[in-house]
């Protein structure tokens, strides 16, 4: 027996040194009632007839001991469970400029947060600009130009109507100018009968040929609210300012919230506006048709330049886009095929002898000033006559002659009628008149 124990002890030490271990962990049924136990099975010495096995139990998480005792404690530790790391998702490659735009768009505040945009005409324009910039991805200068073209396309039917009426007026211009000359001369002469007669004949002539002089002015009257709404919308965005508007420009005008530093845009807008008005792109009436309109047109761009040169660049971007669109539009409407499709009458070339002679700018200005002065004097004279008639209707009759109309010159006075010379002169002679 002692020999078997000695052999078993030597075998235990040999197994512990060589690291040969046999683990038998208690099953789950034993976890509820007993703590986790590690069981070791060691073969006995081979000197015996049959092998003996030593069953060692180690209770508790303690390390095995190599002391002279017959029990070894083994610590059992489960390996930590490491979750599988997911593979990183593929990130699309973006250029540096596009990355900056994406980051700026993501960080940009909406117009509602900035206090812009509403259901007014100005707010609707701001909402349209925001849609084109944020949703469509256009830069601010492109969004302003695209919004301008969209607005001008909406009023294109009015442009065609104005062109039709302008062509009709031009074809009947000699007769219209004759009636206008008769009316003006009758008014200056104070001949009311001739004035109303010429006015009536001119109205009948216009009705017969379907001429309406106010129709060419419908387009400027309609476009004025659109221009004012765009101006206010862009001015509010620049004065706030919208952060992205400060870097949404082009070329030398990167900041759309300030005025043009080298004044190229104001000069370009002035030149294009003069061309638009001179060619009649907005009204359809060329400046050579009406003398007074030509003179006013030539002065307007120069008058507005000192006032508009300090506007924000965003306003000039809209203005320049609108003027360029008008020039392209009038160029297309001069094509005969386009005029035929749109049913615009062809312009008749009149004989210069049938038209009144053209005057220079100074002569026309002096003549207009003289006509205005004469019109004012006639108006004052009519007002004085009206006041005298009203006074005569309310008060007593007043003497309007220097002698007695009852006395005939060259004849003696009747005997029963006393001479007027025998009577003392009254201080108020009109009191003695018949009434």
UniProtKB/Swiss-Prot annotation:
<feature type="transmembrane region" description="Helical">
    <location>
        <begin position="213"/>
        <end position="233"/>
    </location>
</feature>
<feature type="transmembrane region" description="Helical">
    <location>
        <begin position="261"/>
        <end position="281"/>
    </location>
</feature>
<feature type="topological domain" description="Mitochondrial matrix">
    <location>
        <begin position="234"/>
        <end position="260"/>
    </location>
</feature>
<dbReference type="GO" id="GO:0032543">
    <property type="term" value="P:mitochondrial translation"/>
</dbReference>
<keyword id="KW-0472">Membrane</keyword>
<feature type="topological domain" description="Mitochondrial intermembrane">
    <location>
        <begin position="161"/>
        <end position="212"/>
    </location>
</feature>
<dbReference type="GO" id="GO:0032991">
    <property type="term" value="C:protein-containing complex"/>
</dbReference>
<feature type="transmembrane region" description="Helical">
    <location>
        <begin position="114"/>
        <end position="134"/>
    </location>
</feature>
<dbReference type="GO" id="GO:0042803">
    <property type="term" value="F:protein homodimerization activity"/>
</dbReference>
<keyword id="KW-0496">Mitochondrion</keyword>
<keyword id="KW-0812">Transmembrane</keyword>
<dbReference type="GO" id="GO:0005743">
    <property type="term" value="C:mitochondrial inner membrane"/>
</dbReference>
<dbReference type="GO" id="GO:0032981">
    <property type="term" value="P:mitochondrial respiratory chain complex I assembly"/>
</dbReference>
<dbReference type="GO" id="GO:0032979">
    <property type="term" value="P:protein insertion into mitochondrial inner membrane from matrix"/>
</dbReference>
<feature type="modified residue" description="Phosphothreonine">
    <location>
        <position position="400"/>
    </location>
</feature>
<comment type="function">
    <text>Mitochondrial membrane insertase that mediates the cotranslational insertion of integral membrane proteins into the mitochondrial inner membrane. Essential for the activity and assembly of cytochrome oxidase. Required for the correct biogenesis of ATP synthase and complex I in mitochondria.</text>
</comment>
<feature type="modified residue" description="Phosphothreonine">
    <location>
        <position position="402"/>
    </location>
</feature>
<feature type="topological domain" description="Mitochondrial matrix">
    <location>
        <begin position="321"/>
        <end position="435"/>
    </location>
</feature>
<feature type="transmembrane region" description="Helical">
    <location>
        <begin position="300"/>
        <end position="320"/>
    </location>
</feature>
<feature type="modified residue" description="Phosphoserine">
    <location>
        <position position="364"/>
    </location>
</feature>
<dbReference type="GO" id="GO:0033615">
    <property type="term" value="P:mitochondrial proton-transporting ATP synthase complex assembly"/>
</dbReference>
<dbReference type="GO" id="GO:0032977">
    <property type="term" value="F:membrane insertase activity"/>
</dbReference>
<keyword id="KW-0597">Phosphoprotein</keyword>
<dbReference type="GO" id="GO:0009060">
    <property type="term" value="P:aerobic respiration"/>
</dbReference>
<comment type="subunit">
    <text>Monomer; predominantly monomeric at low salt concentrations. Homooligomer; predominantly homooligomeric at high salt concentrations. Associates with the mitochondrial ribosome. Associates preferentially as a dimer with the large ribosomal subunit 39S of the mitochondrial ribosome. Interacts with OXA1L; promoting cotranslational quality control in mitochondria.</text>
</comment>
<comment type="similarity">
    <text>Belongs to the OXA1/ALB3/YidC family.</text>
</comment>
<protein>
    <recommendedName>
        <fullName>Mitochondrial inner membrane protein OXA1L</fullName>
    </recommendedName>
</protein>
<feature type="transmembrane region" description="Helical">
    <location>
        <begin position="140"/>
        <end position="160"/>
    </location>
</feature>
<dbReference type="GO" id="GO:0031966">
    <property type="term" value="C:mitochondrial membrane"/>
</dbReference>
<feature type="topological domain" description="Mitochondrial intermembrane">
    <location>
        <begin position="282"/>
        <end position="299"/>
    </location>
</feature>
<dbReference type="Pfam" id="PF02096">
    <property type="entry name" value="60KD_IMP"/>
</dbReference>
<feature type="region of interest" description="Disordered">
    <location>
        <begin position="400"/>
        <end position="435"/>
    </location>
</feature>
<dbReference type="GO" id="GO:0051354">
    <property type="term" value="P:negative regulation of oxidoreductase activity"/>
</dbReference>
<dbReference type="InterPro" id="IPR001708">
    <property type="entry name" value="YidC/ALB3/OXA1/COX18"/>
</dbReference>
<feature type="topological domain" description="Mitochondrial intermembrane">
    <location>
        <begin position="1"/>
        <end position="113"/>
    </location>
</feature>
<dbReference type="GO" id="GO:0141164">
    <property type="term" value="P:mitochondrial protein quality control"/>
</dbReference>
<feature type="topological domain" description="Mitochondrial matrix">
    <location>
        <begin position="135"/>
        <end position="139"/>
    </location>
</feature>
<dbReference type="GO" id="GO:0005759">
    <property type="term" value="C:mitochondrial matrix"/>
</dbReference>
<dbReference type="GO" id="GO:0097177">
    <property type="term" value="F:mitochondrial ribosome binding"/>
</dbReference>
<dbReference type="GO" id="GO:0032780">
    <property type="term" value="P:negative regulation of ATP-dependent activity"/>
</dbReference>
<dbReference type="InterPro" id="IPR028055">
    <property type="entry name" value="YidC/Oxa/ALB_C"/>
</dbReference>
<keyword id="KW-1133">Transmembrane helix</keyword>
């Amino acid at each position: 027996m002692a020999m078997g124990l000695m052999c078993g002890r030597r075998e235990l030490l040999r197994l512990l040194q060589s690291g040969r271990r046999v683990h038998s962990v208690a099953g789950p049924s034993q976890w509820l009632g007993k703590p986790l136990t590690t069981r070791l099975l060691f073969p006995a010495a081979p000197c015996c007839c049959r092998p003996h096995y030593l069953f060692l139990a180690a209770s508790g998480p303690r390390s095995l001991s190599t002391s002279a005792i017959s029990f070894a404690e083994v610590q059992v530790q489960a390996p930590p469970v490491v979750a599988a790391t997911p593979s990183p998702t593929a990130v699309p490659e973006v250029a540096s400029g596009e990355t900056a735009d994406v980051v700026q768009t993501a960080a940009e505040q909406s117009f509602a947060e900035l206090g812009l945009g509403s259901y007014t005409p100005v707010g609707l324009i701001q909402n349209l600009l925001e849609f084109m910039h944020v949703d469509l991805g256009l830069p601010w200068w492109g969004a302003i130009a695209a919004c301008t073209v969209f607005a001008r396309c909406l009023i294109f039917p009015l442009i065609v109507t104005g062109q039709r009426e302008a062509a009709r007026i031009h074809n009947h211009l000699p007769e219209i100018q004759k009636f206008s000359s008769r009316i003006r001369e009758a008014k200056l002469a104070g001949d009311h009968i001739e004035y109303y007669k010429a006015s009536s004949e001119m109205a009948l002539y216009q009705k017969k040929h379907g001429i309406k002089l106010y129709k060419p002015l419908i387009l400027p009257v309609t476009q004025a609210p659109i221009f004012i709404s765009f101006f206010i919308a862009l001015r509010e965005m620049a004065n706030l300012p919208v952060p992205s508007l400060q870097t949404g420009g082009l070329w030398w005008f990167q900041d759309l919230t300030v005025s043009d530093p080298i004044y190229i845009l104001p000069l370009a807008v002035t030149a294009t506006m003069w061309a638009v008005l001179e060619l009649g792109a907005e009204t359809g009436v060329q400046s050579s048709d009406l003398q007074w309109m030509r003179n006013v047109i030539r002065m307007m761009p120069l008058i507005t330049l000192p006032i508009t040169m300090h506007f924000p660049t965003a306003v000039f971007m809209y203005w320049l886009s609108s003027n360029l669109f008008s020039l392209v539009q009038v160029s297309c409407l001069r094509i005969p095929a386009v005029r035929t499709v749109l049913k615009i009458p062809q312009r008749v070339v009149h004989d210069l002898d049938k038209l009144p002679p053209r005057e220079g700018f100074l002569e026309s200005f002096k003549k207009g000033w003289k006509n205005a002065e004469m019109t004012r004097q006639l108006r004052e004279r009519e007002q004085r006559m009206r006041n005298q008639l009203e006074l005569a209707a309310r008060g007593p009759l007043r003497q309007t002659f220097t002698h007695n109309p009852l006395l005939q010159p060259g004849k003696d006075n009747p005997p029963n009628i006393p001479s007027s010379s025998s009577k003392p002169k009254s201080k108020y002679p009109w009191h003695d008149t018949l009434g």
